[in-house]
Amino acid sequence: MSKMAEEKAAAVGGLGGAGAADAAQQQQLAAGEAAAARVRPVETLLRAAPLGLCVAAMTVMLRNQQSNEYGAVAYSDLGGFKYLVYANGLCAAYSLVSAFYTAVPRPATVSRSWLVFLLDQVFTYLILAAGAAAAELLYLAYNGDKEVTWSEACGVFGSFCRQARTSVAITFGTVLCFILLSLISSYRLFSAYEAPPSSALGSKGVEIAAYPR
């Protein structure tokens, strides 16, 4: 009988601990919601900023073409530049949607924080990859590659290279905005979780996983 009583007491204690943990998490979410209300206008503007940058970079690249006595070249002839246009278009759409999402007050939940965090990460890496690919193309256009006998092309198509360089520079400005947004969303997400107290580590009844050396 005493063993059954102990098991019941342990079960009740476990439920009480879980309830206390849930209450603490709800308090942290409420505090995070109050903080989010104060910074919501700033974050909304910050999320809208990449929209203008993406549209500018996309417009410059879409108009980028040149023809002379040596031939004709357009952005659509190069896969890296086409990827830059597509990535800027997608990021512009996400920037608009996320700005509206942030501007509308709504209760803070862990699931929403996870959603915004993951989307910020995806679009940050998307625009970063597009900028890096286009920058590599520009490097080859300006310097060539002697190992594969590629000659530089910007001496002949200077206007094309200058416009491409402008578009890539604007794209990296977008990258900086998305990195900052990723930091904000990651802070909001992980601040909702309470770290375990250090005094509980190694105490009686607590098992600590140890990895073999």
From Swiss-Prot:
Residues 1-41, 105-113, 188-213 are cytoplasmic. InterPro entries: CASP/CASPL, CASP_dom. The chain crosses the membrane at residues 42-62, 84-104, 114-134, 167-187. It is a multi-pass membrane protein. One of its GO terms (cellular component) is plasma membrane. Signal peptide: none annotated. It is found in: Cell membrane. Homodimer and heterodimers. Belongs to the Casparian strip membrane proteins (CASP) family. This is CASP-like protein 2A1.
